[in-house]
């Protein structure tokens, strides 16, 4: 029977619902997928736009109470600014550090849980940690920066901009400038060099401390193997060179209201030792370098008596006759008597007793000629460890290192060896018993034969560790010792002899005196002996009376007056008379001032010799003045440093102060520029602050 189909009563035609739903789902899925791709594409474009275009160029990465650290991503630099961003203390260029993309972000703090720290690992090359610190002073705050390489052979370098900042401190230079913005030196180890041998190096006085006029101070850790370079008027850079030891670059950066306030706080960290005054009797006696170079003790003794008599004949007062190292060795020679017969020995003994009646200074160094009897005896007696040496692998005995000192092959005292130090002190004691000298000048602390020969030094004698140790030896000699180099030793109560200068008007000569005075004083070395009048670098007499007089005028306001050219050999009686006058001025006016402010330095650490910005730390005019200085806050000295001129511009700091010309009594308001002020050849412009 045929099957009868049931009729559909509904007006809607029959459809297969499963198939239709499946097709609908596929359509919606495709639309959603397209929409997702579109959204993802838009988000990607947005992120790229934010990263490249819309992301702020500056990002705060750490904030203190009134200042903070900003990352400037396009220039790859750190900015230290006030929180209101109205003042930039310093800009630090950090370089690429392995990041090829100069626009790479640098805002992810890995120390996010600690609000006083910022940490970041840069391309697995170096790790940066910045910690905020707060000293006792309420208007000073510090940031501790530590760059740590994460692999070997990574150069670390931070460069400090000189734009709108005058920088001070660091190291003495052959041509000293104040501020140091004009310096131009290649990147080199930041150690004290002998500027006579290495005129492009760093010399005499050096500290890992830099002060900026905006109120910023940088103090580099003493353990860092530091290299420093100056790019004139652009920047100076701190660097730790690539090595297998993965040495970090670490320093503390402090900011304050101005340069004076931050220096008063941070400058204390230059030396944690108690401040003690040296023997100030040295202020009262000029030093006269014996102007002869003889080859025998007999001739030397004759010249000593003759020179002493000439000083008396010209009424130049009592002074100290200074002997160089060669002359000292002639008088110290223990074979001196054996060169003569019995009659001559008696005369020599009589002459030495006359020498003891003179005020003399001798010059010694930690160097010993390899041709000397003492050195040969040390080899025979097995005391080679008295000298800086290398250990011999086979025989176990040290091998002394050769170096050069004043044209001779020498060895250098191993100052970390107590037996060697005792031997040296015995040598000084014997010399004092023989000559009765007033002062001992100790040269030769700078340089290291170990590092000069690219050898691995003992840690105790690496870099500038030798100089503080030598200062300790000098202190054991007594307060009659005088040093010629200083680093990390400003607390030692001894005088320091300054760099030798050229006999000209340049910054390597007369113009460099005041910048050097301000540099030494800022770093804590207030008790210094300037170079001889007219300069002593070339060892020749000054033949220009004008140069001699202008030089004389400057040094008469410094702690000790030193002469190499006798005034009677430079010009006529006028030069001798002026020398007498300025010796008297030094005794009657300057020495009491130095004694007064020496006590202030001991208690407050304020320098004796001060830049003009010490009185006006907010006055930008004072930041670059390098031919005026203050003694304390009460005396301003403005010498003439240009050849052939009897006028100069003089700036008087302190808008609320008044200054009186010491020579004519005229009174001027502070904050005033005296243009074309008359200063005769025989005079120095000196102003005394009037009490308010």
Residue ranges and their predicted role:
Residues 18-29, 457, 509, 618:
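Juxtamembrane membrane-interface segments at transmembrane-helix boundaries in membrane proteins
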Residues 315-583, 615-617:
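Aromatic- and carboxylate-enriched substrate-binding clefts and catalytic-loop regions
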